[in-house]
Regions:
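C-lobe/activation-segment region of protein kinase-like
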Residues: 204-255
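Conserved hydrophobic alpha-helix
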Residues: 179-186
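ATP-binding glycine-rich loop module of kinase domains
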Residues: 32, 37-118
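Activation segment signature within eukaryotic-like protein kinase domains
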Residues: 175-176
Length: 255
């Protein structure tokens, strides 16, 4: 059984007014089947994990990859994938937390693919370039969506602002104009992003920017879907005691 990922969860304790370690989350794989486990031990590297001492639970295939009834409706990514692309797949490290989105990450991928089909037919320089989705057939010869392929960019606006003191100052007026143009284009298509923040704006080496991450995007006047705003797995509410605590996952060290 292969350990795919592990992260430490730190909770903000309102009484202590500080972050404290809560648990380590582990994602494992055996063949095509994925599993998850949590442990109260603070594990810093995958080599420190004894999988025989943790309670391993399966992640249902239907929760990871959704069935596609009509594959012809979806643009398929190039095969093989270009070297300069970003492959977005379901995030499993937050699986089975308190939100519906955390229990059905495959639904978010399918929804974003549907939105991207609108965007690929209506391209804009300030909207990420979508290359298509990856469809694979399971053992029952049923097509499932496994991931989404996009052009890869250098860094997020969040990173660019954080590193600005070491780089050329950011032209904020140009940046804001690009974001505004991208959002106007979306709204012109009758779409609302619902999760615009500096981590969902990417930039290239020339500070040209694009808006990314459309799994929260919905038609205008539509209901919010499984995911919206910052409550997307980066912050996941849990209640290990009587008080509400926010969990912040940090990547464990590699080993």
């Amino acid at each position: 059984m292969e350990i795919c990922e592990q992260k430490q969860a730190f909770v903000f304790d309102e009484e202590e007014d500080d972050l404290v370690f809560h648990h380590t989350k582990i994602i494992l794989r055996q063949g095509d089947q994925y599993f998850y486990a949590t442990t109260n031990q603070r594990i810093r590297a995958s080599s420190d994990i004894d999988i025989n001492k943790v309670d391993i639970k399966p992640i249902l295939t239907d929760h990871i990859s959704q069935v596609v009834d009509d594959p012809a409706k979806f643009t398929q990514a190039p095969d093989p994938l270009p070297n300069d692309c970003y492959l977005k797949q379901p995030c499993l490290i937050h699986y089975d937390e308190d939100t519906e989105a955390s229990r059905h990450p495959g639904d978010l991928v399918l929804h974003e693919a549907e939105i991207c089909e609108i965007l690929i037919k209506n391209s804009h320089p300030n909207i990420v370039q979508y290359l298509g989705c990856i469809l694979e057939k399971d053992r029952d010869n049923i097509s499932r969506i496994k991931g989404l392929c996009f052009v890869k960019y250098l860094k997020s606006l969040e990173q660019r602002l954080r590193e600005e003191k070491d780089e050329t100052p950011l032209d904020r007026q140009r940046c804001l104009a690009g974001i505004e143009n991208g959002m106007k284009h979306l709204h012109g298509l009758g779409l609302v992003h619902n999760d615009l923040n500096p981590s969902n704006v990417m930039m290239d080496a020339q500070d040209n920017l694009v808006i990314i991450d459309f799994d929260s995007c919905q038609p205008e006047f539509g209901k919010l879907g499984l995911k919206g705003g910052l409550r997307d797995g980066r912050w996941a509410a849990i209640q290990p005691s009587a008080k509400t605590i926010c969990t912040v996952y940090q990547r464990s060290g590699s080993g």
